[in-house]
Amino acid sequence: MYFLVADHREHHVIPFLKTDFHHMHQNPIQKNQALLEIKQLFTGDYLICKSPSTILACIERKTYKDFAASLKDGRYKNRQKMLSLREQTNCQLYFFVEGPAFPNPQKKINHVAYASIITAMTHLMVRDHMFVIQTKNEAHSSQKLVQLFYAFSKEMVCVVPTSLTPTDEELCIKLWSSLSGISGVIGKILANTCSVAHLVSGKLPSQNIDQLKTPSNRPFPKKVKRMLISISKGNKELEIKLLSGVPNIGKKLAAEILKDHALLFFLNQPVECLANIQIAQKTRTIKLGMKRAEAIHYFLNWCGSAHVTVDSQNITEASRPTMQVATQPAATQPLHKVSDDASSDASSPTGHQTLSKEMSLNTVRC
């Protein structure tokens, strides 16, 4: 049996891994293979293993800032641990570098030029024979880890591991992440805590926004808090960005829709009314259409695994709930549920070393 071991300090990626592995469990073909274990690792951030104790791959994940810091303080030498592990186990080594693709080479990241980071990445590939994989954010890193895991579990057969169609949750996270400063982790918390409709209708008071925390129990960045409060007060520019995150709605179309009215106005209207909005084009005027209108209502009212239906009669009159802020993502309670309450988890024969040297107990299985 194959399994992926994640270091318990990988707080920002583990929530996405749990979701991605849960989806693998739904596939009968992969049901007995999708196993995630969370332990303390001493080499790398992730290990792809085969029972009982064979290490197949070791993966280290760093953001650009982490990479730059490691170049400055010497932690870049941690690669020696990975090289030593490969010498003992003959495992493959992977280095994930997380962040926006292809910044300006002269751009300073943690006081280190991006060109220097590129040079270090090249050395990892040419000198140390490590696979370097660039990822966009935490969610993308999780997807790449699952793809690697699936490839190893299928003995490197090149197949598509899962459906390329994103889930509603992934689309909603992408919607929140369309706002500057909101990462995939924060977007996931917001997607499972409140809907856009809750925010723009005043159901998420500023004092509750101030209590929101990351999976590591840290407060949201001040910039994000100010932005959420600004949206709740009707900031048109931010509303356009949010609306543009809905599938098949770009920035131009979002700006045209919100040209004369605030986002709350459309959330108060029936879907049929929204579908009849006239959109001016270069040579003609067209209607928004039912499919786009339904997508807007669906994703702006999406919260957790539930689609929240907003009653146009009471969206602005509903009692403001007292939100219960959780410090762990698994305990996060969707805001609409809180509102309702307020109102009514030995060595291998091939010579690979055992895992006991690379991790400690405290296993979490998904």
Swiss-Prot record:
Disulfide bonds: none annotated. Pfam families: ERCC4. Its EC number is 3.1.4.-. Residues 320-331, 349-366 have a biased composition (Polar residues). Residues 3-101 form the ERCC4 domain. GO terms for molecular function: 3'-flap endonuclease activity; crossover junction DNA endonuclease activity; DNA binding. It comes from the Viruses. Keywords: Host-virus interaction, Hydrolase, Inhibition of host innate immune response by virus, Inhibition of host interferon signaling pathway by virus, Interferon antiviral system evasion, Late protein, Viral immunoevasion. InterPro entries: ERCC4_domain, Mus81, Restrct_endonuc-II-like. Transmembrane segments: none annotated. GO terms for biological process: DNA catabolic process; double-strand break repair via break-induced replication; symbiont-mediated suppression of host innate immune response; symbiont-mediated suppression of host type I interferon-mediated signaling pathway. Induction: Expressed in the late phase of the viral replicative cycle. GO terms for cellular component: Holliday junction resolvase complex. Residues 320-366 are annotated as: Disordered. Belongs to the asfivirus EP364R family. Plays a role in the inhibition of type I interferon signaling pathway. Mechanistically, specifically interacts with 2',3'-cGAMP and cleaves it via its phosphodiesterase activity. In turn, prevents 2',3'-cGAMP interaction with host ER-resident STING1 leading to inhibition of downstream signaling pathway and type I interferon production. This is ERCC4 domain-containing protein EP364R. It comes from African swine fever virus (isolate Warthog/Namibia/Wart80/1980) (ASFV).
